[in-house]
Amino acid sequence: MVSSVSRRFLARAAVLTLVSASAWSVPASAAPPVTGPLAANPFLGPLGTATMHGDAGSSDVTPLAGPAAGAGVTVYPLGAACPTLLEGADGLVVGLCTAIAGQTPTVFLFDTAAPGPVGGALASLPLTKGSLLGGVYAFLDNEDRLVVVDGARRLLRVAHVRGDDGAWRLTATVQSDLSGVIPQGDNVTGLVPDWSGNVWFATGHGVVGFVGRDGGVGTVRLPSGESVANSISSAPNGGVAVASTHALYELRAKNSEPEILWRAAYDRGAARKPGQLSWGTGSTPTYFGPVRGDEYLAIVDNADDQVRLIVARSGSGEQVCSIPVPVGGSENSPIAIGSSIFVASTYGYPYPTVPEGAGPAVPANAPFHGGLSRVDLTADGCVPVWDSRVRSAAVPRLSLADGGIHTLRRVGPDSATPLDGFDYVVVDPETGAVRTSTHLPGTVAEDPLQMAALITRGGALWQGTVTGIVRIG
């Protein structure tokens, strides 16, 4: 949910009506530096900017540097929530947003160099409407085309071209009609290519499959009652990870059909937690590891008393560790690279709406205290490193270039009010301390709703909000 579902939500939330903290439990000395490999999928656009979570493995890590201190702010008032913002090799930003009026998914094209305090789109293209979370997740392929499944259950590739008149246009080509394998009323919530070029998808009602490069389609259905509310991930080893509302799966393509390699149930708790969008994990599963970048998978469960970070071995599903994290609950995909994992709390986050069928939250609401935790995977298992009180209001993004975790922080009382504001902050991954903080204009009309940010090659951070985009830098 991107995740997210992308997570990351929401277009999730667009759908709706408008309506300083420091680190604690910090070790005496800084933790080891965070580093590790990022696997570049040959069928995706640039590493770090082609998917909601940065790459096919959903690391939420980028090789690019974020904004410098004191960078200017540009607001894009689009009348739409923008959970998916991606940058292609041509340096243009493509957004997949959901219009507040009519809840129509819309593709936008933006110029990253546009000056001024208020920005706009170069072109837009409405898509067929589906569910609240259907179409939230998309990716840019290696030709800078947006790959998405629309509400009519068609796999589209949306290209942007500049005409002789200088105007930009968005054009959609149907790659595959999936209405024969995805039932009416069901929608795709996760989408990713594997290393062979198959485009994998997962639906809210538990259909998992892929469209092959030859156009063939293969599917498998998860057990009755299991749904998929977050996006999916792929790895160089051929694996594709899916987290349902009950279990973590790893699959692969075999003889033109998806094969389930293993299934590992997790503690989904007694009900949906406040600040989450489904009853179960809020994680898009994250591939990571110190050698290839795909040795392990990480998710956060939904246990009642205290949620746990779960790390499983890719390929076998063997549980490597399970450790409590003091975040209450998380709707965000973990950041993970090398041997380090970061988990952000969304427990109590005031989403204005939740997907149909999400079920009641227990309790119905709760204060949003926030929190960000680092856990390292060692020879002895998972070891807690630090916990921070940062009230992250977006999916945090770790930059390997500048060594900071970039996010937006909600400012106001823990109970959350319409007068709350937001800061752009950079957190030190070695200590959990806030390095820099910049106050942003606006209040809940610019709520990032736990959506993922994009860091561009030009060093700007683009953050989707409930009404459009805030660009820093």
Residue ranges and their predicted role:
Residues 2-127, 135-136, 142-145, 468, ...:
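Sequence/structural signature of beta-propeller modules
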Residues 68, 121-130, 169-184, 260-278, ...:
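Surface-exposed loop and turn segments in beta-propeller and other repeat-based domains
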Residues 77-87, 126-142, 178-192, 225-236, ...:
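Repeated scaffold domains used in trafficking and secretory/extracellular systems
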Residues 97, 295-299, 332-443:
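Loop/turn-rich, solvent-exposed surfaces of beta-rich toroidal or solenoidal domains
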Residues 100-111, 152-163, 205-212, 246-252, ...:
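Structural motif
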Residues 122-134, 152-153, 159-196, 203-205, ...:
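Asp-box/WD-like beta-propeller blade repeats and closely related beta-sheet repeat scaffolds
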